[in-house]
Amino acid sequence: MSEVYEGAIGIDLGTTYSCVAVWETANVEIIPNDQGARTTPSFVAFTETERLVGDAAKNQAAMNPRNTVFDAKRLIGRRYEDPETQKDIKHWPFKVIDNNGIPTIEVNYLGEKKQFTAQEISAMVLTKMKEISEAKLNKRVEKAVITVPAYFSDSQRAATKDAGAIAGLNVLRIINEPTAAAIAYGLDAKSDKPKNVLIFDLGGGTFDVSLLKIQGGVFEVLATAGDTHLGGEDFDNALVEHFIQEFKRKQKIDISDDPRALRRLRSACERAKRALSSVTQTTVEVDSLSNGIDFSSSITRARFEDINATTFKATIDPVAKVLKDSKVPKADVHDIVLVGGSTRIPKVQRLVSDFFDGRALNKSINPDEAVAYGAAVQAAVLTNKADSDKTQDLLLLDVVPLSLGVAMEGNVFGVVCPRNTPIPTIKKRTFTTVADNQTTVTFPVYQGERVNCAENEPLGEFQLTGIPPMPRGQAELEATFELDANGILKVTAVEKTTGRSAHIEITNSVGHLSSTKIQEMIENADKFKQQDKDFAKKLEAKSQLESYISNIETTISEPNVMMKLKRGDKSKIEAQLAECMSQLELEDTNTDALRKAELRLKRTVQKAFASLR
């Protein structure tokens, strides 16, 4: 397709599932994938012959656990030694190695060991979402708005933007998931009176709570809180651990080091978790779980709630935090909107309702699609495709999720930009030298809420040199923190007497890639895409040849043909059939060889049958 789509798509890049939407004819359309599903598993699988993305990857996960990658969102922009990363590695069947502090996924693909970053895996999922939209629009898609959890750090946001670039997308904006969901909620319910709306977004792997003031088309985030490492996957993990222990107790077999058994048990636990949102008891069944032993166990909703009690309760702390940060009393929250598949869990709904003194919760928007919906609206606004009264005054005012600053003497965190500051923004703070005649100052940049920098996240550092020698404390060094609409940071420092300056765009933090590295990954992605196309063509040629062989074998076996066909001609056809079968059995055969074999067989058949006329 040569025609380029003028607008942009909205993508909800989820931990477990992703969703894509587009603004068309004054409305948002959620685009189904080739299976007809409106959400696509965020899974990528590698085999000896091909790469699979989405449903096809998830469906074969139990047979190929070590080479089926999921949860890339839990790795993106994180360091290998991060405690959360280490915790996750214990649950994943695929291998994650330390590559200079960057967690890197190692798989077997096309008979070789290959290594991929979380950005590259995410880019493969984004490419799939891009292709889904292109199939619908019949145009090439080049622009997108991608959503991230509100509590994502600068590194995680930048890494997500890089993933978009690797997928061949111009990422117009990174927007926060709860803000996108608020658009889905508020677009059709505009009011001139201000409304305080709490978005409770509990997905497959991340959790956000945002409080917004919505008035007309203005969506102003007052405060945000959450946990980038809490969601449905954690509830699955707890169930899996529960049943591992039960199987061990009953059968004296430990399956914790058996990736295939774990994948099958995880799938059964995920189904049970979903079922328990609508029934009070269900059964977890896995045929031949280990050593030919079938596993079957019933679980009640009450037991499921008990197993996850601590995790469920942890979802309420961020709710209290946003109300405290925004100084908005419970009673002044007009609506509590549930977003994310995990909000279907009755216990979660009860906890939220109880916190708000038994208030009814708003379930008016589709929890799986709301975020992509809001992203599509923002995409339409940014590309001037939003041609509706509903969107003409739309304005998003988001906030910084975590404080930003620099390390001062004693490794104390000097906050420059406090959390919940509206973005885009520019914040300044003056620092000074700590030693006499100091001519160089290093500015280590951090993000977090702790006093000790060691307990916050390092984003990068830069040096300001050429400071005139003077007694300690006399130099005036002004640090400027500039945050763009994506929440991505640029820091500048100026020595006021000389005007000498230095700056850093946070690009050397873990997760953010250099432009050279991104280009290299784009080329790799194109190479994999070509390999996928080549494999599909080979499969088609193989299938076509097999079908033709079958037809010819049937034809020459028919009595009336056998009687008329010359013995020599039949022998030639049989020889060609044998040659074609040999070609099909070759491991390293290619599309060209298969097509040539089919052509030779066709010519032999045509010559033989010409003599029958």
UniProtKB/Swiss-Prot annotation:
Residue numbers bearing the Phosphothreonine modification: 40, 516
Enzyme class: hydrolase
Residue ranges of the region described as Substrate binding domain (SBD): 402-612
Region called Lid domain (SBDalpha), residue ranges: 515-611
One GO location term (cellular component): nucleus
Source taxon at top rank: Eukaryota
Keywords of this entry: ATP-binding, Chaperone, Cytoplasm, Hydrolase, Nucleotide-binding, Phosphoprotein, Protein biosynthesis
Chain residue ranges for the region called Nucleotide binding domain (NBD): 1-390
Motif Nuclear export signal positions after renumbering to this chain: 573-581
Subcellular location: Cytoplasm
Principal subcellular localization: cytoplasm
Modified residues (Phosphotyrosine): 151
UniProt region (Inter-domain linker), positions on chain: 391-401
Catalysed reaction equations from the record: ATP + H2O = ADP + phosphate + H(+)
Pfam short name (any one): HSP70
Binding site for ATP: 15-17, 73, 204-206, 270-277, 341
Function: Ribosome-bound, Hsp70-type chaperone that assists in the cotranslational folding of newly synthesized proteins in the cytosol. Stimulates folding by interacting with nascent chains, binding to short, largely hydrophobic sequences exposed by unfolded proteins, thereby stabilizing longer, more slowly translated, and aggregation-prone nascent polypeptides and domains that cannot fold stably until fully synthesized. The Hsp70-protein substrate interaction depends on ATP-binding and on allosteric regulation between the NBD and the SBD.
Subunit comment: Binds to ribosomes. Binds close to the ribosomal tunnel exit via contacts with both ribosomal proteins and rRNA. Directly interacts with nascent polypeptides. This interaction is dependent on the ribosome-associated complex (RAC). Interacts with pss1. Interacts with fes1.
Family, as annotated: Belongs to the heat shock protein 70 family. Ssb-type Hsp70 subfamily.
Name this polypeptide is given: Ribosome-associated molecular chaperone sks2
Gene it is expressed from: sks2
